[in-house]
Amino acid sequence: MTQILNPLTDEYYQLKELVLGKEFPWFYETNPNELEEGYYFYSHVFLERPDRCLYPSVRSQHIDLFHTVIQQIFEYNNLPIDIIYRMNANSTPAQDGCVAPHVDHTFPHKNLIVYLNDAGGKTFVGDEVHDPKEDDVVIFSGIHNN
């Protein structure tokens, strides 16, 4: 897991204000790991993962802003980007314990997480741990459970 720089652009702050605002639509989701009961989070899908279809599909009217911010982050860090399979915002309330590891996709990929606040909750990828601060950005290989 590697922490990269967040350019903190005007578009980033616009996206952050949108996602953390009162009017942003969140949808209740249960644990992605069906072996655990009681774990939940809220989600807003911008670009749906290509699980049941060979291509991802747009699910949010706000995708262009999210896409711009992701491109800015990659360009600022001089990182190549070939394709985006999924774009999603998650909000996870504090809960007892940790959720079991899960795999986001069954094919080779990389994950990018942008932390819009510092509400707590560590990210575990294999043996690595990130204790996020507001506006942190991390990237890691999708071959690991997270």
Model-derived segments and their meaning:
Residues M1-D82, T92:
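Non-heme Fe(II)/2-oxoglutarate
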Residues R52-N146:
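Catalytic core of non-heme Fe(II) oxygenases with the double-stranded beta-helix
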